[in-house]
Amino acid sequence: MPALGSQRRLLGSLNCTPPATLPLTLAPNRTGPQCLEVSIPNGLFLSLGLVSLVENVLVVAAIAKNRNLHSPMYYFVCCLAMSDLLVSVSNVLETAVMLLLEAGVLATQAAVVQQLDNVIDVLICSSMVSSLCFLGAIAVDRYISIFYALRYHSVVTLPRAWRIIAAIWVASILTSVLSITYYNHTVVLLCLVGFFIAMLALMAVLYVHMLARACRHARGIARLQKRQRPIHQGFGLKGAATLTILLGVFFLCWGPFFLHLSLIVLCPQHPTCGCIFKNFNLFLALIICNAIVDPLIYAFRSQELRKTLQEVLQCSW
């Protein structure tokens, strides 16, 4: 972990070395004095990780407690919370180890630190991939519930949902192991970036289509009730605002990290790209922020889940 100096080693193998197929090396010292580097203290990383940890533990506990929430939709939300939980645990673990090493409290061999770092890298990478997958699964689930409402319960069954969940976790673990093992190959970085773009496109297409369907439905209701046009416009604006927040948070939190991976392939020695490389810690912090925001968007908006959450908190006291 300390090998990168000022940069953390979360997914450090994807950050410190360019692909083997490229004869170039990252040159952060050539970025010049005009680079803007945002410093993220370890204490802030630890705080963000703990907040995310508490939030997502509460989501998992609430869904596990309430049998009314034992449905495919909430299982996908629960798995998203578990993915974000792994992001938080990885962050807290790495930050704690880094602080102990810097303070001289923890003394260990470099080989042990490297092995621990590899484990954390696999954990964080698998949690990132699974988080993106479950965000896509939630979008598909909502799409089916709107466009195939009468067939929803025959299409999205519990056994089928469990198979999808198991496949996502297995694929995420295998992907993370392969990514960390073959981090110095261009194709690995390109596959990760392509996966992010595919998930972003999938979510954008599905949610935009759902918004268009909802607006048409609102127009139909307005015509039946002989309502005026401003009511429909208000619904459309509310839906557009929700869609903007949902996709905007996803893009702002995940986009910079995958831009970083893209630039490692495209311009590892360019001074401007070097400036972006210096903010690797900021990009990781944004991903942790996404783990904080996800429960607010996908879980806490459910009245049933909020009610169960209150019961969980009351029991804990």
Curated annotation (Swiss-Prot):
Transmembrane region(s): 38-63, 73-93, 119-140, 164-183, 192-211, 241-266, 280-300
Pfam families, alphabetized: 7tm_1
Subcellular location: Cell membrane
Superkingdom of origin organism: Eukaryota
Keywords: Cell membrane, G-protein coupled receptor, Glycoprotein, Lipoprotein, Membrane, Palmitate, Receptor, Transducer, Transmembrane, Transmembrane helix
GO cellular component: plasma membrane
Lipidation (S-palmitoyl cysteine): C315
The UniProt record lists the keyword NAD: no
Residue intervals annotated with topology Cytoplasmic: 64-72, 141-163, 212-240, 301-317
InterPro entries documented for this protein: GPCR_Rhodpsn (IPR000276), GPCR_Rhodpsn_7TM (IPR017452), Melcrt_ACTH_rcpt (IPR001671), MSH_rcpt (IPR000761)
Membrane-related topology note: Multi-pass membrane protein
Glycosylation sites: N29
Gene Ontology molecular function, alphabetical: melanocyte-stimulating hormone receptor activity
Residues exposed to the Extracellular side: 1-37, 94-118, 184-191, 267-279
Subunit structure: Interacts with MGRN1, but does not undergo MGRN1-mediated ubiquitination; this interaction competes with GNAS-binding and thus inhibits agonist-induced cAMP production. Interacts with OPN3; the interaction results in a decrease in MC1R-mediated cAMP signaling and ultimately a decrease in melanin production in melanocytes.
Family under the similarity heading: Belongs to the G-protein coupled receptor 1 family.
Protein task: Receptor for MSH (alpha, beta and gamma) and ACTH. The activity of this receptor is mediated by G proteins which activate adenylate cyclase. Mediates melanogenesis, the production of eumelanin (black/brown) and phaeomelanin (red/yellow), via regulation of cAMP signaling in melanocytes.
Name of the featured protein: Melanocyte-stimulating hormone receptor
Source organism (scientific name): Ovibos moschatus
Gene it is expressed from: MC1R
